[in-house]
Amino acid sequence: MALVNEHFLKLPGSYLFSDIAKKVNTFKITHPKRDIIRLGIGDVTRPLPKACIEAMHKAVEEMTSAETFRGYGPEQGYDFLIEAIIKNDYAPRGIHLSPTEVFVNDGAKSDTGNIGDILRHDNSVGVTDPIYPVYIDSNVMCGRAGVLDTESGKWSNVTYMPCTAENHFIPAIPEKRIDIVYLCYPNNPTGTTLTKAELKKWVDYALANDTLILFDAAYEAYIREPDIPHSIYEIKGAKKCAIEFRSFSKTAGFTGVRCGYTVVPKELTAATLEGERIPLNRLWNRRQCTKFNGTSYITQRAAEAIYTPEGKEQIQETINYYMTNARIMKEGLESTGLKVYGGVNAPYLWVKTPKGTSSWRFFDQMLYEANVVGTPGVGFGPSGEGYIRLTAFGERDDCIEAMRRIKNRL
């Protein structure tokens, strides 16, 4: 008989955002006339940039002619997009990449979840806490996370590095050696960042301990302050210890279109049990050729348009719109006496719940009293207890109204 992967049975009954959806749906059934403002899940609301739409229309037209029709594309991505990525996202920062080091995908979530395919199941894992749930869940699925302690909410083979107000949301460098470390900056969910000096400490640690850093830079386009690195490869030596994930979802509104990319440097290696060094670029390329058929041509043409002068201008307008939302929300929440972190270099606000209220309790208060949906911080890890995450991706009027409700009703 067929046997299941029993590691899946270790996962909590449902995904965080599924639990939120169930609570919201229950509220809607019992309060059908209430107008709910959703500031929880980080989905965007602004339309795609005009440059991307025009590029997609043109690509669709190409599909109508035998001379310009495109079928299967390269699993790694089309050269035209990869070259645009390198020219615009890396070369201006003094980072040299080969086209074969960039892998176009259908969004950063896929690759951050799948990168473990090329890594042994018994590697030790380190995560900042709180953390994007996909990092933990994907390691549980392959057996790498160990056993869940239901009381603490922690997995036995995962080292948790608390990010709290007390340490300014800067994770301490581990005292012990860890095989794989996940870093996400600008951070989801806290909206905080690391300076170059702080990120350099992690690169130095990784080089000294033969640690692999999985660096999620999905929100780098929102960085405003000058000393915040946009790429881990701005740090000397990072190509020898880090894989970087990028996404067009929040940069250009591609949450429904689906496109991003992963950088796996050729000089990055990991070891076999016998000590042989294996290039991870080679393994990831092999994995993609087997399990991924590439991102669609139409989508990649849309992504290429992001890097045109018109595309850059339109994208910046959208990013400015969301960051203005973040400022309005941050100021509104602080005016009520709430302590708010993030919202400066990222579209997320990490809000301390009042009077020691638990994350889920404050979620319920916001939903039932203000009819505003956030995300309970504890859903991102044990150190998220006592916080709630709000996103700035809503419509301007909704953000303003949500702040009014929170101020007047809570």
From Swiss-Prot:
Gene3D superfamilies: Aspartate Aminotransferase, domain 1 (3.90.1150.10), Type I PLP-dependent aspartate aminotransferase-like (Major domain) (3.40.640.10)
GO terms classed as biological process: lysine biosynthetic process via diaminopimelate, diaminopimelate-aminotransferase pathway
InterPro entries: Aminotransferase_I/II_large, DapL/ALD1, PyrdxlP-dep_Trfase, PyrdxlP-dep_Trfase_major, PyrdxlP-dep_Trfase_small
Keyword Phosphoprotein: no
Domain of life: Bacteria
The protein's enzyme class: transferase
Keyword Transferase: yes
EC assignment: 2.6.1.83
Family: Belongs to the class-I pyridoxal-phosphate-dependent aminotransferase family. LL-diaminopimelate aminotransferase subfamily.
Protein name from the UniProt record: LL-diaminopimelate aminotransferase
